[in-house]
Amino acid sequence: VDFYKHSHIDFNGLEIENHQFALPIKDGPEMKALELELRRLICSSEKLRRMGSTHLYRPSADFNALFLVAHAVGHFLYESIRLRSVLDWAFFIKKEHASVDWEKFCAWCDRINYSKFVMCMNYICEHQLGMKLPASVKRNDEMGAYLPMRILDDMFKDDALYTKGYGGLMFRIHLVGRYFKNLWKFQEVYERNAFYL
C-alpha cells in the first residue's frame, strides 16, 4: 500500500474513502496502541452486528465509542469541531450506552488523555442539550462549566483556519497559524505539550 491516510475507490459512481488506518498512527505510541485495539474490536466477530438482511456489518459499540471520540479529538486539537460531533456523541450514547463496556472505554480515555474531552462532551450533552445521561456514562460535575463552554464557544466561531484549497507556502502559513490558535486545546483539554509525539 503506497498511501498513509486513504485512497479513493469508485464504486458505481460513488467515491469511497479506503482508509489504511482508523487513526493517525504517526502521532505516537498511544495512537498505535489504540489503532491495534480498534482493529481487535472490529475483528471481534461475536460483537459485529448485521445490518438488516444485508451482508453488511456494523462494528461493536465499544469500537464506535472509542473511534467517535478519537476522531472528534483529532479534529478538535488540530482544526475545530462543530456541533455535529457533540450530536454524534449524544445520539450514540442514547442508542448504544447499554452495549458499551464503559470501564474499558474510560481506561483507554485515561491512557490516551481523552478523559477531560469526554467529560466536556458529556457536560455539553447534559447541561446545554438537556440530555439525561444514563448512570453508566461517566460525568465530572466538579470540573465546572468553564472548559466545556470554551469548547462550545470554539465550535461556533467563524475564524477556523481551514487549509482546503491552499497549496505550497500558503498551506504552511495557515497550518502554523491554526496550530498556534489551538495551543490552548493541548494545554487545557489534552493536557499534553503540543509538541508531544
Regions found by a protein language model. Name each.
Residues 1-197:
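Conserved NTP-donor binding/palm subdomain of two-metal-ion nucleotidyltransferases/polymerases, i.e.
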